[in-house]
Curated annotation (Swiss-Prot):
Taxonomic lineage: Eukaryota, Metazoa, Chordata, Craniata, Vertebrata
Protein name: Cytochrome c
Main location: mitochondrion
Modification comment: Binds 1 heme c group covalently per subunit.
Organism: Trachypithecus cristatus
Residues with N-acetylglycine modification: 2
GO cellular component, one term: cytosol
Length: 105
């Protein structure tokens, strides 16, 4: 897949202002992502999602994250996530590799 260390840097630069990944991490503007892989959209306990996120009905995995992270508002119209996305496929792969590791520790 991608490079975990590069993915960690991407998360710190582009995601950590709004998200945490560690077990027991607090929700910020966006939800904590611990346990993300295999979870359906809009299901992180204790986070208030839009109906669009709750109703999307997909399960997060490498393929769904690859598409979502390219353009979140296109993938889930009505999401409150303001991030424009990551256009470079390699950067998305690196981030997903890190998320897969960090959200399961």
């Amino acid at each position: 897949m991608g490079d975990v260390e590069k993915g960690k840097k991407i998360l710190i630069m582009k995601c950590s202002q709004c998200h945490t990944v560690e077990k027991g991490g607090k929700h910020k503007t966006g939800p904590n992502h611990h346990g993300l892989f295999g979870r359906k959209t809009g299901q992180a306990p204790g986070y208030s999602y839009t109906a669009a996120n709750k109703n999307k009905g997909i399960t997060w995995g490498e393929d769904t994250l690859m598409e979502y992270l390219e353009n979140p508002k296109k993938y889930i119209p009505g999401t409150k996530m303001i991030f424009v996305g990551i256009k470079k496929k390699e950067e998305r792969a690196d981030l997903i590799a890190y998320l897969k590791k960090a959200t399961n520790e």
